[in-house]
Swiss-Prot record:
Keywords: Cytoplasm, DNA damage, DNA repair, Hydrolase, Metal-binding, Stress response, Zinc. It is found in: Cytoplasm. Zn(2+) binds at residues 86, 91, 123. Disulfide bonds: none annotated. This is Protein/nucleic acid deglycase HchA. It comes from Escherichia coli O8 (strain IAI1). The gene is hchA.
Amino acid sequence: MTVQKSKNPQVDIAEDNAFFPSEYSLSQYTSPVSDLDGVDYPKPYRGKHKILVIAADERYLPTDNGKLFSTGNHPIETLLPLYHLHAAGFEFEVATISGLMTKFEYWAMPHKDEKVMPFFEQHKSLFRNPKKLADVVASLNADSEYAAIFVPGGHGALIGLPESQDVAAALQWAIKNDRFVISLCHGPAAFLALRHGDNPLNGYSICAFPDAADKQTPEIGYMPGHLTWYFGEELKKMGMNIINDDIAGRVHKDRKVLTGDSPFAANALGKLAAQEMLAAYAG
């Protein structure tokens, strides 16, 4: 007899009134191994250009009923794109708004993945000891070695990044200096940092996690309540076009902005980003 997994969010005892996703939702949307494949870059980049990862530094996201969702950056959405980019020859640095450590949704970590987990262990210190984004921004100029800015997904991207002037400055620098911007799922919420000033992403098309899907996740206990705002609605108000209305592992390229719709797009986005960056920097 099959026992139905619970759809009740699981208590996170590290914080008052905080919750992890339900057993049922984890069984549907996480896996102990990833879908990493196609990592084949026979002529990797050998230069000095690298990736700047803007990571989440806050774990708890308030929902409409006062309960907190225990979140952070999604491991698959973070590590698979970086795995491809690293294999293609691009090193990376990590920055957070505060300079404090990256928060991960460890409940989504592919802990039995024989490629992703060693990669994570190899680079864990970068996530534990990130740069402070303001310090990075202060040093940016036309000759800076960052070839791309990567904003991973996970609901942690909804906390702080959309209001950060440092995030806005980093994105403005990237677009104006012909660098790549890479993001997926909830990561594009960081683009909202541009909405109150100079917005070089006006008119761009992207893939992102649909608001409609976010509105459904509390039904299966993925979140302990509904979001208090929806980033897709806000991106559209600032002139961006979200081309997907479902979660199908879709990726999209608009000039040098490369995006994906969900963790199901992480591997494909990694391939796309590696191919595009090799063409630009190693061609």
